[in-house]
């Protein structure tokens, strides 16, 4: 990828790792993922990005991520939640692609950013109507 951040543990890279972990976790929690699944995804992304000693604490309303190897710690408030298992599935798919080195860390972050803004959410009335037609 043009302009990719080098694989050295630079300050910018550490910040990108933590931003990517937080974004993935935020999308998952806001979309109805279980806390343990969110934490697992965050720690896997960090480990695959070169931070095997990450620390993650997640509740239904917040995410805390840090690295034991440095003073990097970040938190994110999760003020709202809904059910959008498509987003949860897509975050997991992107995480697997990153683990298999099919995409780079900057690509993962970019795709998560697009996923956060471009994946449609549906109103409750529309979801109920679709359930009526599938039942």
Where are these regions (language model features)?
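Short, amphipathic, aromatic/basic-enriched membrane-interface segments that mark the entry/exit
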Residues: 114-126
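Short, glycine/charge-rich beta-strand/loop segments that flank catalytic centers
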Residues: 60-63, 108-113
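Conserved small/polar residues in nucleotide/adenosyl-binding loops
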Residues: 132-134
């Amino acid at each position: 990828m043009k302009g990719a951040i080098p694989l050295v543990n630079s300050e910018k890279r550490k910040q990108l790792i933590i931003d990517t972990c937080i974004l993935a976790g935020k999308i998952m929690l806001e979309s109805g993922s279980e806390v343990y699944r969110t934490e697992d995804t965050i720690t896997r992304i960090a480990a695959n990005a070169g931070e095997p000693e990450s620390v993650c604490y997640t509740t239904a309303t917040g995410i805390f991520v840090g690295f034991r190897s440095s003073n990097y710690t970040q938190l994110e408030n999760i003020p709202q939640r809904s059910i959008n298992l498509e987003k949860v599935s897509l975050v997991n798919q992107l995480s697997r692609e990153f683990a298999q080195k099919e995409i780079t860390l900057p690509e993962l972050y970019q795709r998560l950013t697009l996923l956060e803004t471009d994946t449609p959410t549906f109103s409750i009335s529309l979801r109920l109507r679709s359930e009526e037609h599938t039942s």
